[in-house]
Regions:
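The feature captures the catalytic groove of carbohydrate-active enzymes
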Residues: 2-25, 30-34, 38, 45-121
Length: 121
């Protein structure tokens, strides 16, 4: 792997569970899915550990360097105007002050995919 390709500023919307489930549906590769389960769980938990400012189970986008532009990148919608009025909340692992509906919808759906993966693979 090329370490210059790593982006430590932010992550992207949580779609890994969906992707793994789609791979499983096509390949029936249970070994691959079983290998991915702990990684999927760790990634899902990461959101609540590092991107839930007030611990109310609703996450916010953010960045590791404290920049608003990197927090916007985390959404996958880099220049979306909906983030223009947002602020970085200091002391919060640099999350923005908005609980985005899309992010929390992705996380809810990820829970469903984790359930499917853990129970059917």
């Amino acid at each position: 792997a090329d370490s210059s390709e790593n982006n430590w500023l932010n992550t992207k919307p949580p779609l890994s569970g969906w992707a793994i489930w789609e791979i499983f549906k096509e390949t029936k590769d249970t070994a691959f899915v079983v290998e991915m389960i702990p990684k999927l769980i760790k990634y899902h938990e990461w959101w609540y550990k590092y991107r839930d400012i007030n611990k109310n189970k609703l996450c916010e986008y953010g960045s590791s360097d404290g920049s608003l532009v990197a927090a916007k990148w985390e959404s996958g919608m880099d220049n979306a105007i909906r983030f223009d009025a947002c602020k970085i909340v200091r002391g919060s692992n640099y999350s923005i002050n908005t609980e985005s509906v899309d992010l929390n919808s992705y996380l809810a759906k990820e829970k469903e995919y984790l359930f499917l993966i853990k129970n059917y693979c």
